[in-house]
Amino acid sequence: MSRPKNQNYKGHGLQKGKEREQRASIRFKTTLMNTLMDVLRHRPGWVEVKDEGEWDFYWCDVSWLRENFDHTYMGEHVRISHFRNHYELTRKNYMVKNLKRFRKQLEREAGKLEAAKCDFFPKTFEMPCEYHLFVEEFRKNPGITWIMKPVARSQGKGIFLFRRLKDIMDWKKGTAGKKLTSLEAQPARNTVNPSGSHDTRSSDDQKDEIPVENYVAQRYIENPYLIGGRKFDLRVYVLVMSYIPLRAWLYRDGFARFSNTRFTLNSIDDQYVHLTNVAVQKTSPDYHPKKGCKWMLQRFRQYLASKHGPEAVETLFSDMDNIFIRSLQSVQKVIISDKHCFELYGYDILIDQDLKPWLLEVNASPSLTASSQEDYELKTCLLEDTLHIVDMEARLTGREKRVGGFDLMWNDGPVSREEGGPDLSGMGNFVTNTHLGCVNDRKEQLRQLFRSLQGQKKTPN
């Protein structure tokens, strides 16, 4: 159980074994009234706890975590949906700092070739503290396009593109050091799921609120891969159960998010051309939710294979695997790896014309609000499989390489796709145990998995 530390603590969460066995239900709590609530309420043996009731499982928002984590006692069995300092990866400026540091570390320890595997994020400067470094870089490469992003906002708010130094000078005079209002830092409210429930918090990815607004200035990818003349990015889901040792799962499904307007560099002020966020696109005058602003990753992978062949697609998706692992390794030593914590990250990836993937950002609270029935089904399955891996029911053995739509890609080292394969990625025909954009026969896999686990329980050792 969990309980605030400042209350009269009498061993909550450390009940005797017999008492624990008698309590069959798992008490959950969440502040998110979206697809997640639907999944939690329909999970057998799980009961909702409201207000200050004691809980075993809490899918919280990042604001609750910041205000309460350090003051809450959690028993051995309790699980919570964020790592304490998740922002080391999910704040844009911290993510870049950690990746730059990790790249330098790799260059010292393993050489430039290994360090080059971290070259998957555009040249970036934190503003205003690296303003003079940015100006120096800007003058070396005049005429290119840059994109300015606030480090702690979501839904495309505060983002703008520029090519003139005057634009950034005006920004520095008028915006640097501006304090965020609570309204600016929080997502929109009162959206509705296909299930009919209202989402009061996460209509899009939640971000940390910070007292002073910082930005990152990032070199804009001017040659994005286009489909039908439109720009898109990919949303991919990675589940981390532990940082020490690093244990990470990759979900097979995800989606491509398209802009509503054909791409051009002639109108850098048009957000409908350059920003693919659903929150931005749905404000477009000609937006229609059924027009095709999202593709499932399986469709996207098939499209690329038909255009470029399966070998090129395998290389692209292998490069994305590298992004997931290297980014997690970059924060492995700074994230507080509390055994009570897990995290479902939403990775945003951009593909350029050379089929090179670029990491745009990592979201600590990827939107769980559905924009269509297909989106609702994806997120429902994603959350169900996340709960299977968190395993509050203690059904798994810990040796599983696949659970539903999740594949174990890293377990204190790379995981081989084939049984009996080598343990080191530099050996032989090693193929990482990932299947992003492949067939997701999760229902059949779960049926076989739990039947096998049930059989193991019945068989005496």
From Swiss-Prot:
Coiled coil ranges: none
Catalytic activity: (L-glutamyl)(n)-gamma-L-glutamyl-L-glutamyl-[protein] + L-glutamate + ATP = (L-glutamyl)(n+1)-gamma-L-glutamyl-L-glutamyl-[protein] + ADP + phosphate + H(+)
Residues binding ATP: 149, 155-156, 218-221, 231-233, 276-277
Keyword tags: ATP-binding, Cell projection, Cilium, Cytoplasm, Cytoskeleton, Flagellum, Ligase, Magnesium, Metal-binding, Microtubule, Nucleotide-binding
GO biological process: flagellated sperm motility; microtubule cytoskeleton organization; protein modification process
Domain of life: Eukaryota
Gene3D superfamilies for the chain: ATP-grasp fold, A domain (3.30.1490.20), ATP-grasp fold, B domain (3.30.470.20)
Site (Essential for specifying alpha-elongation versus initiation step of the polyglutamylase activity) location in chain: 155
Protein name in the entry: Probable tubulin polyglutamylase TTLL9
Protein source organism: Bos taurus
This protein's encoding gene: TTLL9
